[in-house]
Amino acid sequence: DHRDLHSFPTRRSSDLPEGLKESDKLPEPIYTPSTKAEIGDHDENISYEQSIAHLEKYFPGKGEEYAAKLRDCTIALYKKCADYALSRGIIIADTKFEFGLDENGNMVIGDEMLTPDSSRFWPVEGYEPGHGQPSFDKQFARDWLTSHPDNDWTLPDDVVQKTIDKYLQCYKMITGEELA
């Protein structure tokens, strides 16, 4: 996990190694659970202890077990996918996984995963901690919107095309194939 320090609202700075710079690789991935918000609202990051209590409300007697299973599965998935992406020239700086339970109580993926919409992908080439990184994700469109606050949230065609090109480049790097 390479996120910048501002991305950790549930973390105290004392939880992180000293001397980190923006975009530094963390020694180990950080698991940050969140609750699923209503449509239109933002998911809320919570502590691991809060995740146990939250799960306990819905699954009495299972909160601790499910929280541990979610944490362990999330970190294992991230590590496996991050290693693969790295072998293809991409750093997965951060990502989110959404899980649910099926009718038998088995954990299942509940939404997209490891897409440019749910992750931050950086090229290995040119990676240099200490500042923001170029990316293959929606950050380009976000940055454009942020730098044009008077805009009515309409992206110009060239920004849309550049975002599409970034997604396609990422796809090709990961799969080795062109998207038709």
Label every PLM stretch briefly:
Residues D1-S13:
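Short, small-residue-biased leader/transition segments that mark boundaries at the very start
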Residues G176-A180:
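Charged phosphate-binding loop/patch that engages nucleotide di/tri-phosphates or the phosphate backbone
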